[in-house]
């Protein structure tokens, strides 16, 4: 029943370009008993629409966050982060902030993957190998994006005031902050 309703909503959204699909909580255990591969709305919608260009984003009055990766085990996050992935996610986020939120020149803060955003390669290499090169390319294309920020200080009062959205590398890096501020 739940998947049938979600399928119907997806089809209606695809056929009417002026609509949006807003999802809410659902009982994943019930769905997984029917579809063992179900991990969440984002992945399911991506599968149904056969789209590579998807972004999981949550927004409240206080904060907008998006995810580079979605519902994957933490052990798989580092190997999933690539320059191409970061570029794709930031471009989608930047475009959606302009079109859906009417923000002329979005300010996007990107979190690093590792503690202290890797400390210039001392704590992991993902920032140096993938994240920073992606952000430099995006800046050359005039996208207003930060260099990788340490997650433990990214959500300072100043950053919250001057940022239109944050891109986190994984699910539980940014969602707890959004939920603490907004629920």
Q: Where are the model-predicted features located?
A:
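Anion-binding alpha/beta catalytic cores of soluble intermediary-metabolism enzymes, centered on
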Residues: 1-183
């Amino acid at each position: 029943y739940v998947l049938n309703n979600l399928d119907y909503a997806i089809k209606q959204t695809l056929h009417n370009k002026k609509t949006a699909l807003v999802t809410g909580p659902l009982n994943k255990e019930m769905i997984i008993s029917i579809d063992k591969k179900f991990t969440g709305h984002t992945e399911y919608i991506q599968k149904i629409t056969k789209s590579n260009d998807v972004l999981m984003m949550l927004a409240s009055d206080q904060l907008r966050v998006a995810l580079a990766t979605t519902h994957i085990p933490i052990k798989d996050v580092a190997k999933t982060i690539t320059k191409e992935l970061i570029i794709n996610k930031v471009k989608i986020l930047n475009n959606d902030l302009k079109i859906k939120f009417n923000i002329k020149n979005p300010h996007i803060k990107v979190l690093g993957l590792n503690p202290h955003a890797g400390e210039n390669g001392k704590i992991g290499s993902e920032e140096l190998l993938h994240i920073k090169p992606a952000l430099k390319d995006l800046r050359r294309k005039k996208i207003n994006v930060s260099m990788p920020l340490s997650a433990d200080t990214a959500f300072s009062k100043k950053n919250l005031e001057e940022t239109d959205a944050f891109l986190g590398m994984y699910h539980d890096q940014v969602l707890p902050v959004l939920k603490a501020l907004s629920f």
